Every structure is written in C-alpha cells, then in structure tokens.
C-alpha cells in the first residue's frame, strides 16, 4: 500500500534529482548489539575492523559463513550503548540467526531493532543536518536520534515514533517521498547490498566490498577469513559488481539473471543486485558479473540491450 506521507516520486532519466528528500526506509533494518563482549564478539564475525572503529565513524562490512559466502552486507556504527548494523530487511532474519550462532558463549545481546529508519538524500540534506546537530562527524547523536553518513548524498537517521512527528514538522524544505529515491542514490554510488535471493551465494569481493573499505586484511581471524584472503592474495575471485544501464518494462529484482554476449550468442552472464527504473523506462542496475569480460561485451535483460557504466570507484588492488 502506497504511503500518503511518503508518496512515489516519478522521475525521468534526464530530470535533475531533488536537492533534499526524506523517505522512510521500510526495506531496510538494523541489527543492534549490546553487552560487555560486543566488540570482541563482532570482531570475530565480520570482515571489517570493529576494534578500530571510532565512535563517530561508520564502515561497510560483511558477515560470511565458514566458506566465505556472504550472509549480509551492512554499514556498522556506534548507536546508543552498542553497535548498529544497517542492512536489507529481506535477509535480516537469516542474518540474525547466523550472527547469533555463537553468542551463547559471550556476554552479548543481539536483536532486530524496532526503531524507525529515515533516509535523507540530496546535495542539501547535509545542510539541514548541520543546522540540527552539534557535530560535523560521520556519525552524530542528536535529539532526533543517531545520524549516520551512508554516502556523500545519503544520511540515515535512526529515530523513534514520537521523535519522528516533531522531526517531520521541521522538514518544510524537504520533499517527502518513498524510498525508491534512496535506492537510486545507493545505485549511483555503486553500494552493494544483500537481499534474500543473494544470501549465502557470493564472497565479499564479488560485491566490491574491498573497494569501499569493507574488508580489513590486517585484523585477526573471523568467520570466512581464509576464503576472503585467498581471493585477494591468490586471485581466486572471478566476479565483481558493475553498474549497468538499459531499458526495462519493469524494475529488475535482486537475483534476476542477466545474459552476456558471446560472439553472436547469449549465455547467462550474472545476477542483479539492485535496480532503479525511471518513469521513461531507463534503468540503472548493479549486477555481479565475471571480472574478465571484454570491454565491448553487451548484456541482455528483459529482451533489451544493456551496457556498462563507469563505476564511481576503482576495483584495482593497491
């Protein structure tokens, strides 16, 4: 059911994006972690360095099984008296089960938060946040809750129902709209995510986690580390996530197959991670593809030809 408070924003490909939007992020959720052993427990579970994470910083990370396959990709930050892991809701029940698997041996409480998640997007979102917070850090505590910087044009606010009402009364400058605009910014920044169809299918490097500082190769042991390290040092990873552009009749979904050209034929080429469809049919998508394809390789999805778009970051190892 469409929200009347956060209506759909119907954009065409060549339209400028709104300079300031606020959306309720119903397709996202938080896992929170508190307790005396929270830091050491999480450090042994995830790809990022929890120990070195400053109070006012945020980092990408992944949680893998013993074979290095991802249960989830998240952004981790300090929240209240513990940690928050911001990630896709469709896979969060599976992720909760997996990340709690060894918690019985530690003083740690792990749960899915019932807090409200609001997404602030656009070039002027930061101006508003600066006016209503006392910090210029990437994670800020305010009277409305915790603000966390997701990308240069995206900020997350973790808040509550009663604070949300007061907040909305102060947002006259913002366009309130549904969370599709958040997805568009996420895709333009080529930020990875794991929805249920991709759960436990790929190693972190297949979703470019190393390129956005989501993997520490200097920290101690964690679940799946051996596979992740081999992918870096022995070159066993054969996939990466790319940004594609094409036309579609309907928005592609996570897990959809995309074909690639091989001579004059087509064969399965990869898997959709996320997509945004403009009103005129133009569509941007992130897809996991072989990382050794020729530059002139074409792709086909929904009987339409798609092409690569340059990523906003480099995939080359340092």
UniProtKB/Swiss-Prot annotation:
Its main location: cytoplasm. One of its GO terms (molecular function) is folic acid binding. Folate binds at residues 28, 182. GO terms for biological process: iron-sulfur cluster assembly; RNA modification; tRNA processing. Keywords: Cytoplasm, Folate-binding, tRNA processing. GO terms for cellular component: cytoplasm. It comes from the Bacteria. Coiled coil: none annotated. It is found in: Cytoplasm. Folate-binding protein involved in regulating the level of ATP-DnaA and in the modification of some tRNAs. It is probably a key factor in regulatory networks that act via tRNA modification, such as initiation of chromosomal replication. NCBIfam families: PRK09559.1, ygfZ_signature. Belongs to the tRNA-modifying YgfZ family. This is tRNA-modifying protein YgfZ.
